[in-house]
């Protein structure tokens, strides 16, 4: 059984040094219909990232968040007591990444780039190699229609996004007849 991981971030900007509000991750086997498993969901300490790590907050992104439904805003910005430090976020993500064959994100220049910058800020190496990186956006663009449109019920929740993206990778592999890891 292959073990791939899907990661998604919700951030306060689109630049590599943007504050990470939430990180979602889920493991899955792209070659089967098995349910994604081993979820990880972390809320980052926004104040620590901004003040101690000098990570950025973009006004346009804040304005975009203000136009989202209230439930989504509450999940992202609410007074949650479980927010973790950068060091703790990276420690838990490192532990979660153990045993992954490949790691996916929705697009090659957002989540991966922001995470790589966060690891660099924390003076830690990323827990994946460059050759393990996979991009779901490109895969979905090759489908007759975007598979996320048919199944995704919740938007802008990092863990929910991961779940739906993992399920769509499975559907895409099945559509294209991909049966092995090469």
Give the ranges of each region predicted by the language model.
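Residue-level signal for well-ordered alpha-helical scaffold segments within enzymatic catalytic domains
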Residues: 92-95, 113, 117, 141, ...
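Short, flexible loop segments at boundaries between secondary-structure elements
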Residues: 127-147
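Short, function-defining helix-loop hinge/capping sites that tune catalysis or transport
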Residues: 16-18, 143, 169
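Conserved non-catalytic scaffold segment of RNase H-like nuclease domains
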Residues: 3-5, 10-105
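Anionic group-transfer/hydrolysis microenvironments
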Residues: 10-12, 26, 107-108, 113, ...
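Acidic, Mg2+-coordinating catalytic module of metal-dependent nucleases/exonucleases
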Residues: 102-108, 113-114, 147-182
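Hydrophobic positions within alpha-helical membrane elements
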Residues: 13-15, 140, 166
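Substrate-recognition/cap helix-loop segment adjacent to the acidic, metal-dependent catalytic center
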Residues: 94-97, 109-130
